[in-house]
Amino acid sequence: MDYKKEGKEILEGIVIAIVLYLVISLTLSYALKVDNPVAVVISGSMEPVYYRGDIIVIKGTDPASIQVGDIVVYKRPYQDIPIVHRAINIIEEDGALYFVTKGDNNPFEDSYFENGKKFPGVPDYAIMGKSVMKIPKLGYVTIFFKRLIGVRI
């Protein structure tokens, strides 16, 4: 058994996987008009629509086109993890749009705070886009690596 050759083949496989991931991610990012076109579901808040470990594909969306019932993806200013919840109400206040969101499996609506101020919902500028597709359970790979090396992939 040639360990040097096997090690080289494993390294080549890892490099190819990383390059493929980057090419696919950049292509999706451009095509879907969003910086981060994929997210991993890490909680059960959207069951039975999405389960922990599902990967969702995000499409950048003009917030004005979002309707009640759409599943939106947003980020809070103090968290790097995208939140995937359903828009259950839309509030227009002083010319700004706010989306009241809630996980299908959660008992309460989401709260949104920024700089100590509570907003009536998720502000339009925090919306990344809408969920347009899911890949069941594939996200467990990234959850595993995150736990293994302590880094978000």
Q: Where would I find each of the regions flagged by the language model?
A:
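Short, glycine/charged-enriched secondary-structure capping and boundary segments
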Residues: 54, 72, 115-116
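Acidic/glycine-rich C-terminal interaction modules and beta/coil loop segments
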Residues: 31, 35-42, 64, 82-153
